[in-house]
Amino acid sequence: MDDGGRHDTSIFSGRPSDLIGRQIAGYRIEREIGRGGMAVVYRAKDLRLDRTVALKLLAPELARNDTFRGRFTHESRVAAAIDHPNIVPVFEAGETDGVLYIAMRYVAGRDLRHLLDREGPLPVKVAARIAVQVASALDAAHDHGLVHRDVKPGNILVAQGTDSDHPEHVYLTDFGLTKKSLSLTGFTSVGQFVGTLDYVAPEQISGKPVDGRCDVYSLACVVYETMAGKPPFQRDDDMALLWAHQYDEPPPLTEKRPDIAAPVDDVLAKALAKSPDDRYDSCLAFVAALRVAATGAVETGHAPTQVDRRAVGAPEFSPPPDPPDWARPVFPG
């Protein structure tokens, strides 16, 4: 139980540092390690089992929505049942003093966002090693009926690997709170949709039903960024970016990375197809095609990726309508 038995809003009131040292649901808060619009993640100590965990606390208003609470319970149980080396294990999910929480394995690594910000575009072999581990995790989730819907560098943790042949161990996180739960319960604001703009599939934008192929699209956006340094679509405002995902063709990766084999462009174009039916059927099928296409790539002599130890052929479509001025690229031509 929460120490002091205070009301749920006390957990989210004041400064984040106010929670340091407090006990919540049998966990002692040590420090904040991540924050989003609907949740805060802390490193915490499991006082019952004497282990370090990542404890995610959801915004109190989520617990007050019965539909969300039901889906949260179901999806957390499904996520906890997935035993996969590239998925962060969920230890426990529950509610205390009106706040929903998820306790997960604490991964000693940094996320892919941090790695890209620090190192820029990655060598093809490094990008492929990361991609295949994420793809394996996603396909395992799909086999259990879970679609992630928010694959992005910030949800991909990169930890130290076991040896020189496996220098990175990658974990996919944020399965206990899939974005469908938020969309079904009204926790999206007017003018917003569920997903992260740079990586969202066209069908998510249009509100159509989604399956694992939306994760194929998002993974392809991430893979593109790992090798190009930027996501495939760069626009000057959110509406233009949404338009690009729905109607614009992705720029060939080889324009930014001429050292990469040309067939990689075709693989990425298929994975980034506007229609799910024109994409690869699975994430691993996409990455397998990517690795085959990249065999002719010329490595540029980058040093091996140093993982931070402190923490962890395009299908044809009918021509789209001409975009309005606000939807044109920031750097046309």
What are these regions (language model features)?
Residues 59-81:
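AlphaC helix of the eukaryotic protein kinase fold
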Residues 45, 132, 138, 198-301:
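C-terminal lobe helix-coil module of Hanks-type protein kinase domains
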Residues 12, 63-67, 159-209:
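Activation segment of protein kinases
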Residues 81, 130-131:
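Hydrophobic/aromatic scaffold residues of ePK-like serine/threonine protein kinase catalytic domains
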Residues 134-146:
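Protein kinase catalytic-loop region centered on the HRD/HxD motif
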Residues 30-36, 41:
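Protein kinase glycine-rich loop
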Residues 93:
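Activation-segment/catalytic-loop signature of the eukaryotic protein kinase fold
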Residues 97-111, 115:
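Conserved short submotifs of the Hanks-type protein kinase catalytic core
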